[in-house]
């Protein structure tokens, strides 16, 4: 009985162990099957896409554009600006860093597969047809290749391609500097097909005229300009090989005036004010007034030369040139004013000397007459007893002597008054020069600061 119970217990135990082992084996078998299936599925997808790409490129001729002989190839473009600047005034060019995107449709690259869009390696770009886009006003362009070529290529199942590359472009920026430094400019970026005319390839903006060119919020790298906005458009040119479409994007710039106020305008204004200080100096202070005049003229000459160093050698006068020229005229006029005052001062001294000489002659004549009358009076009185004290002087002698002294004192006082007097020209200059210079500044700044810049060939930014 005991043996039967023991054998039954062993059978139950073995049955339980068998069930547990079956469950464990089934569990591990269930968890391993999906992993194997995923790997197989992934390998299958890679194999499928490899076969698709090999099939697409089999017999593909990248020398021929899509739709050759059937339709015009349309290339849609847009630009994302990551960095704008710097701008060189002397070279009239600017530098821009962009993501340049192009999209077109190539029916030869249609495919059917588990994915609608294939992100491809940039190496495939050399095996398919791509637009021959070039920049008309570009002086130098760099395609970034670190750490790999900065290019992106995507293919959709209907044959639509998206081709993006990162470029740094140095382009021409024609500038009209008549209003410098209160000027504004529209720097263009022009691109299009090099070989295909409008009858074969046309360019259009992807997102219309408002969102096809976007500048990053922190993309401005400008020290002397404000980036006011950008506008896009198209141009058509006709050559001997056909008509071509040129895509244009204008970047609107407004110059910052602060640097030039500190470096040029304030020094010029202070130099003019310093030249007018000489009007308040004594007109006989020839060395001091000469130093004021010559120093201010030389200072204005130095300022005018240094102001031109930051500009290209244009053949017309800028707004700053006009301001410097007027300041130079005020400084030079102050020097001429001193020369005029000095001339009339010396002439006045000569006139005073002539008067003094005539007065001296009259004085000598009076002294001769006085001596004769004194001698006659002394001779006539010798018969009378000398009861008059030595200190007492005859009335006639006393009166004559007093008359002869007074003219000398008056001439001396007049001479001193002429020497220390203020010139009428200086009095007028103290009022006229500051008023005229203040009026000029008022008109100058009101005219240029309120002027709306007109840029030919570019619409104003919205």
Curated annotation (Swiss-Prot):
Keyword field: Cell membrane, Chloride, Chloride channel, Disease variant, Disulfide bond, Epilepsy, Glycoprotein, Ion channel, Ion transport, Isopeptide bond, Ligand-gated ion channel, Membrane, Postsynaptic cell membrane, Receptor, Signal, Synapse, Transmembrane, Transmembrane helix, Transport, Ubl conjugation
Membrane-related topology note: Multi-pass membrane protein
Disordered: region residues: 377-412
Disulfide bonds listed in the record: 173-187
PROSITE patterns: NEUROTR_ION_CHANNEL
Compartments where located: Postsynaptic cell membrane; Cell membrane
Binding of 4-aminobutanoate, residues: 101, 164
Domain of life, source organism: Eukaryota
All ranges on the Extracellular side of the membrane: 32-260, 309-318, 449-462
GO molecular function: GABA receptor binding; GABA-A receptor activity; GABA-gated chloride ion channel activity; ligand-gated monoatomic ion channel activity involved in regulation of presynaptic membrane potential; signaling receptor activity; transmitter-gated monoatomic ion channel activity involved in regulation of postsynaptic membrane potential
Disease: Developmental and epileptic encephalopathy 79: A form of epileptic encephalopathy, a heterogeneous group of severe early-onset epilepsies characterized by refractory seizures, neurodevelopmental impairment, and poor prognosis. Development is normal prior to seizure onset, after which cognitive and motor delays become apparent. DEE79 is an autosomal dominant form characterized by onset of refractory seizures in the first months of life. Brain imaging may show hypomyelination, cerebral atrophy and thinning of the corpus callosum.
Family: Belongs to the ligand-gated ion channel (TC 1.A.9) family. Gamma-aminobutyric acid receptor (TC 1.A.9.5) subfamily. GABRA5 sub-subfamily.
Protein name: Gamma-aminobutyric acid receptor subunit alpha-5
Species this protein is from: Homo sapiens (Human)
Native organism taxonomy: Eukaryota, Metazoa, Chordata, Craniata, Vertebrata
